[in-house]
A protein has these predicted regions:
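A short acidic, Gly/Pro-enriched loop at the edge of an enzyme's catalytic core
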Residues: 121-132
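Short alpha-helix
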Residues: 189-205
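Conserved Class I S-adenosyl-L-methionine
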Residues: 211-281
Length: 281
């Protein structure tokens, strides 16, 4: 069902709920006891802790493993990984809030979450520091350069794992892409298809890509986020930037009838580097 933008911003929750799906809480037993606000608040982008849960399921997480949460925003995913798996999480973001240590302490994981305010391209860690890298709704902002995957992989131990979850296009967009799909332009130009991301990491010769697919709830995550934002606060109570973003997402969903705009997950394991022979031809 399409959303009637002619009524924007004077919309009712009945219309919102009839137009967009909500991710069912029962599909995520690890989030039992969480409110929908706790699943979404403090997280940029779509998917909330639903997407974080699915990403974590791909990793081999247990107490004591060292995880780099890269581009963690406010650190909500870092607290989640420490709380549910006992992981020692290094929460890295260049705009990390000062409130993270207190929030981690209140969640009972103050000793497991280490805040690190740093640029993703200038990580202050020695090689082989981590068992896993986790990056949700952030990697496309800094990781599309061909040289970035080899740089990042140096911080993983041998056989260490990496998981990325992010918005994506089902296929690569071209110059004729509908204007509605170019959300957050020009950042959207760094949003790619799962196949693109598979090649991006595989060509390093240093990893085995185990999974690079559209998320089965990829389109649903967009709808669920709109529902939450409008249920949490009516448009007239939003800041102009947020109100405009919600309207832009609705326009995109109205135009996208077959799930071209979605989300993906990539899971890779670091292996022995392939020694490429120089071409002197």
């Amino acid at each position: 069902m399409k959303f009637d933008l002619s009524a924007w911003p004077e919309v009712g929750l009945r219309q919102v709920r009839s137009a967009f799906r909500a991710v069912p809480l029962k599909a995520y037993p690890e989030l039992a006891g969480y409110s929908r606000a706790e699943i979404h608040e403090g997280l940029a982008g779509q998917g909330g802790l639903f997407l974080a849960s699915d990403m974590a399921r791909l990793l081999t997480l247990k107490a004591g493993v060292r995880v780099l949460d890269l581009g963690c925003g406010e650190g909500t995913t870092s607290i989640f990984l420490a709380r549910h798996f006992g992981a020692r999480v290094f929460a890295v973001d260049e705009d990390l809030p000062d409130s993270l240590p207190l929030r981690a302490s209140r969640a009972g994981v103050g000793g497991l979450v280490t805040p690190v305010r740093a640029d993703a391209r200038k990580l202050p860690f020695p090689p082989g520091s981590f068992d896993a890298v986790f990056s949700m709704n952030a990697f496309f902002y800094f990781g599309t350069d061909d040289l970035y995957p080899p740089y990042l992989l140096r911080f993983l131990k041998d056989r260490g794992e990496l998981v990325i979850g992010s918005p994506c296009y089902r296929e690569e967009i071209g110059a004729d892409a509908p204007e509605e799909f170019l959300l957050e332009f020009p950042a959207c130009l760094a949003v790619h298809s799962p196949d693109w991301w598979r090649r991006h990491f595989a060509k390093t010769g240093e990893v085995e890509v185990l999974h690079a697919e559209l998320h089965p709830r990829g389109a649903e995550f967009w709808e669920d986020r709109v529902r939450f934002l409008l249920e949490d606060r009516p448009p007239e109570g939003m800041k102009p930037g947020m109100r405009n973003m919600v309207r832009a997402i609705i326009r995109m969903l109205n135009r996208d009838e077959d799930g071209f705009v979605s989300h993906f997950m990539l899971h890779a394991r670091k292996g022995k580097p392939i020694k490429l022979q120089p071409n002197h031809g």
